Amino acid sequence: AYDMTQTPSSVSAAVGGTVTINCQASEDISANLAWYQQKPGQPPKLLIYAASDLASGVPSRFKGSGSGTEYTLTISGVQCADAATYYCQSADYSGSAVTFGGGTEVVVKG
């Protein structure tokens, strides 16, 4: 498994603003990186897979980028509904060892 370092731990943004969340892997994970959104009392929702591919039904204001060890989730035109905790996640190629980042709480100020 890999170590995933996610920053920042918390970020606030105004409605309409932009949020950037970073995730650094301890070794090259070859874009084997997903981003999840989790709201209290709900299961995690897949946003991005393979570093930059948007999951079905996810608004295009969510964008994933990066390669090697450095990855970014950008939320443009932030909406109140985007208030949540976001996690990066990687797995080895067997899928047997899954590693999550520590999470980033996004607070949206109306």
From Swiss-Prot:
Residues 57-88 are annotated as: Framework-3. GO terms for cellular component: immunoglobulin complex. The keyword Transmembrane helix does not apply. It holds the Pfam family V-set. Residues 35-49 are annotated as: Framework-2. Residues 100-109 are annotated as: Framework-4. Residues 1-23 are annotated as: Framework-1. SUPFAM superfamilies: Immunoglobulin. Keywords: Adaptive immunity, Immunity, Immunoglobulin. Disulfide bonds: none annotated. Residues 24-34 are annotated as: Complementarity-determining-1. Residues 50-56 are annotated as: Complementarity-determining-2. GO terms for biological process: adaptive immune response. Residues 89-99 are annotated as: Complementarity-determining-3. This chain was obtained from an immunoglobulin that had no detectable antigen-binding activity and that was produced by immunization of a single rabbit with group a streptococcal vaccine. This is Ig kappa chain V region 3547. It comes from Oryctolagus cuniculus.
